[in-house]
Amino acid sequence: MRSGGNKYLASLLRCYRDERCKLSGKVIHGFIVRMGMKSDTYLCNRLLDLYIECGDGDYARKVFDEMSVRDVYSWNAFLTFRCKVGDLGEACEVFDGMPERDVVSWNNMISVLVRKGFEEKALVVYKRMVCDGFLPSRFTLASVLSACSKVLDGVFGMRCHGVAVKTGLDKNIFVGNALLSMYAKCGFIVDYGVRVFESLSQPNEVSYTAVIGGLARENKVLEAVQMFRLMCEKGVQVDSVCLSNILSISAPREGCDSLSEIYGNELGKQIHCLALRLGFGGDLHLNNSLLEIYAKNKDMNGAELIFAEMPEVNVVSWNIMIVGFGQEYRSDKSVEFLTRMRDSGFQPNEVTCISVLGACFRSGDVETGRRIFSSIPQPSVSAWNAMLSGYSNYEHYEEAISNFRQMQFQNLKPDKTTLSVILSSCARLRFLEGGKQIHGVVIRTEISKNSHIVSGLIAVYSECEKMEISECIFDDCINELDIACWNSMISGFRHNMLDTKALILFRRMHQTAVLCPNETSFATVLSSCSRLCSLLHGRQFHGLVVKSGYVSDSFVETALTDMYCKCGEIDSARQFFDAVLRKNTVIWNEMIHGYGHNGRGDEAVGLYRKMISSGEKPDGITFVSVLTACSHSGLVETGLEILSSMQRIHGIEPELDHYICIVDCLGRAGRLEDAEKLAEATPYKSSSVLWEILLSSCRVHGDVSLARRVAEKLMRLDPQSSAAYVLLSNTYSSLRQWDDSAALQGLMNKNRVHKTPGQSWTTYGNDLDSGFRK
């Protein structure tokens, strides 16, 4: 009778649990206590189930504590409840106190650790489980693989894959999807994930979504599109997460193959239409993804239309719009959206303010950037970094350093980004003392061997011509340096005219086989080849460029063109230039300059006219290049016509360099009076360089009278310059007026004016050396 009564009570408790009738359950609880049935573990487990289902933790705890005998079910039930409510501390306490555990116990503990963000601890618990002789279930592996995904531990994930194969769980859709997600996030979707997908008998929307996301992360554009197409053909339901993943491949990203440009914004628009057709028009996450795609593809008009039609927006939506307009140099729109955001009741977060700051500085609106920064109550280090980066990128280096000092007064500790920005500013200003102070700060911190910091320090000392210090810093950290530091050191050698050392260091880097040269490495070392006029080395590096896949990089293309031009291989330069698919203004300028440098002025002018007819807009450097070519080839009238067209047709105001070219052109042609008139009529008549050019022409044509007049003007403009004395002395010497030349040398000594020694390069076989001559 007693046993039958217990079964009846247990049945009632199950019914009350299913219906969540806690009050009725408490009545039964009271009856059990009065009848002395608390020792019945089975009944107590039913009470525990009731209170857990009703979410009454206090009574569940009371029942659990008062149980005289607890079995594995009791422990698991209470552990499951503590895990469900997220009470990690008590869950660990219950788990550690369990006299015996089963797979459910381990699964609960691993699951709660993963959910609460303790993935590493979850993996440790899993290892303990295996050591205790328990075989993982599908729930175990799913949780452990989720932990591997979050900590990006693909190696441990592969071990779990092996366990799944041995236990036959790899074909289970639950485990299979977890494997796909892990491989996708760890970057192994192509190597291993696709095989897992193919082994699943009936992949579902989660399977397809994971594979598409992984392929998108690895920039496998075509494969991702094909997988999405297969998903649609199989009739698998497409959800908003899948659409977000496929959308991500239509955004331009570094390292993405050319197919991303083919699909690009067009694919984004197609997915947008599909999302509307499938009824996801109100999905906030998907709409934010769409906004981001339009913004990244520089279609802010389209993004603004989507934003206006969104039924719901959040801070992320506003931030995407603000960043997008900033990338397009439209700070006015960024500020407008910030104002609208506040008016709509949204509180801008730090990301918002930093985004607006970036937009303002990117657009050159420094004053608005200052106001936005001043409106931040307590700027964080990230906000200061955005401000300092803005000043530095806009070439306001002094203000960057000044604001850095203000930041220090706020008792904020600069991070590696802060110090990198300030080191860059010090390098640009050649502010050695400031660089040394930052160096001291770096030595006292744990970031002394951070690659960005090391690169910045090398740049500072190189710009300040302290190459011995740069080399010490480089050698001290050589085993921990990345490509940026090597590039900085190579660039330092090039900047200090140590081009041979630049070539040697590049070879050393290439021979290590640890780091591969990038486009910056090649552009820098090719520049050194240009200055050394070393065609042999230049061709070797050209071969490496092709082998490394950087031949279509715009900087490398320009450097190669320049190298061939400087080495006198003008036809090779033109052949390479013609093969360039996307010519920008810089490479046009380089080729025009190359023709001029090699005395082929007619071809330089012809290429200039071809540039104009192609629709490429010339800049100031274009005109310097073509006017120089006119000067060296005696194309006086053509040069004057091109100078006249600068302002009249192209809207470019001639600067000093342009007038120098024309004065030189007129002077070379013997039209010295015209050259003098032009020099007097320019806004730069107080520039000594302009008159030095004219004085040099006087020597060539033997015009002593004009030479004296110009030399006197030069001496007034720059009394300590040796140019006037040397050029006038050379004029006297060319006309055999030795007494006048000697008198001028005496005057030069009397006034303590010294001539700067020249430098020349000497080639010994394949090696290069430099020497000085006076």
UniProtKB/Swiss-Prot annotation:
SUPFAM superfamilies: TPR-like. Residues 690-765 are annotated as: Type E motif. Pfam families: E_motif, PPR, PPR_2. PPR repeats lie at residues 5-39, 40-70, 71-101, 102-136, 137-171, 172-203, 204-238, 239-270, 283-313, 314-348, 349-379, 380-414, 415-449, 450-480, 482-516, 518-552, 553-583, 584-618, 619-654, 655-685. This is Pentatricopeptide repeat-containing protein At4g20770. GO terms for biological process: RNA modification. It comes from Arabidopsis thaliana (Mouse-ear cress). GO terms for molecular function: RNA binding. Belongs to the PPR family. PCMP-E subfamily. Keywords: Repeat.
